[in-house]
Amino acid sequence: MELDLNNVAEGVVEKHETAARSDSGTSESSVLNGEASGAAIAPAEEGSSSTPPSPPPPPAAVLEFSILRSSASASGENDADDDEEEEATPSPPPHHQHQQLLVTRELFPSAAPSPQHWAELGFLRPDPPRPHPDIRILAHAPPPAPPPPPPQPQPQAAKKSRRGPRSRSSQYRGVTFYRRTGRWESHIWDCGKQVYLGGFDTAHAAARAYDRAAIKFRGVEADINFNLSDYEEDMRQMKSLSKEEFVHVLRRQSTGFSRGSSKYRGVTLHKCGRWEARMGQFLGKKYIYLGLFDSEVEAARAYDKAAIKCNGREAVTNFEPSTYDGELPTDAAAQGADVDLNLRISQPAASQQSPKRDSGSLGLQIHHGSFEGSEFKRAKNDAAPSELASRPHRFPLLTEHPPIWTAQPHPLFPNNEDASRSSDQKRKPSEGVAVPSWAWKQVSHHHPAPPHTLPLPFFSSSSSSPSSSSAAASSGFSKAATTAAAAQHTATLRFDPTAPSSSSSSRHHHHH
């Protein structure tokens, strides 16, 4: 078998038969078996040698690939009978060709691209090496933490004011909204006290009032809500006013200054058509009625006078307090007219009583205090009579006529003979002892007899103790003072805690 891989570019005569072609058109191969009996000797003109022909070679099988066939023309072909032989043995080129061109092609060139398989059997050929993907096996790691946010710039600390924080209910300093009144009220601190500046309908007006007061109280360096240049006119006016006077001016300008239908404080229009003046919240009372007046000004002046009497120069008035200097009593007179409101009952010394005071109307001395041991301890001191004598302006219970209680018994002041007789007998052993200061004595010039003690039954429990009796006896007035008091043309009631009650005196008389 001989494999011919040489193709003759020109001169190779091939005889193709269209019937012998394969229908697939992909590849053709034919194995030609030459037999000795059927083989013919090539013609003489085809050979270039004149020697006799040699015997034919043994039959050979030729494998021919159609893809290696050239496109030479078939003009030099012999007869149809010699097709198979010519295909097996190619004829030499014609004489007119100077040389024979042979082209050798490699079946599997090394530099050629990968061969194409006609049957497209991709699984029979190895694929060209492909770049392997970069596959890495990593251990499971926690997800990376997100980057921390950039640090926010810290706001600068607000300047701490010297006057405390701003109000929670208002954006202005010194202004607070009160739900009870429905107004914006302004206050300022001065010397540890909160000063009321007035109530206003708007927070802006209240802030203006605070700024004026702050400039007056603390100067131009005060912390205010608005610009200092807005208050140049106010600063010129406030130079001639004191703090109290300027506060009064601010209060009069406020909305909450006046109440009712009048523009003046403490003045309202009565249903009868006149103007009523009254002052509120004094000594626990809701208001104090001051009277009806024909004009608002008169009612306002009446209110101002009452406010000054009760609150002094710090009172809030409709007009300047200086306008009432000639109409109001002086401070010394007001202090002399003060009433001692200590809760205890004491009798002034006889030297303090004068006919002018005796001719006055009924006066009652009321003392706020306690009946506890403080008074009894004070009564044990030897200086108790001098202390009582040094207290001026006492109001004893004085009458120009003898009391009628001696003839008509009273449930609180019983006046029976047994009680008088028992009290006289109890007083006889101590003739030289001074009269107690804790007694209500009945003294009158119509009765030359010794003064009778009117016992009080509701003090019997505390007066029956021996300690209280001795204390009262040691702190009493002298006998001369008692005699002088009895010589006056008045009747004085004194309470004696040592005097027994009616029930105790009756029991004492029964035992005797």
Curated annotation (Swiss-Prot):
GO biological process annotation, one example: regulation of endosperm development
UniProt GO cellular component terms: nucleus
Induction data: Target of miR172 microRNA mediated cleavage, particularly during floral organ development. Repressed by SRT1 via epigenetic histone H3K9 acetylation (H3K9ac) regulation.
Gene ablation phenotype (knockout): Larger seed size and increased seed mass and yield. Enhanced expression of starch synthesis genes in seeds leading to increased seed amylose content and altered fine structure of amylopectin. Decreased proportion of A chains results in abnormal round and loosely packed starch granules but reduced gelatinization temperature.
InterPro entries: AP2/ERF_dom (IPR001471), AP2/ERF_dom_sf (IPR036955), DNA-bd_dom_sf (IPR016177)
Single GO term (MF): DNA-binding transcription factor activity
UniProt feature, compositional bias: Polar residues: 21-32
Short sequence motif EAR: positions: 341-345
Compositionally skewed regions (Pro residues) per UniProt: 141-154
Subunit organization: May form homodimer. Interacts with TPR2/ASP1.
Protein name from the UniProt record: APETALA2-like protein 1
Gene it is expressed from: AP2-1
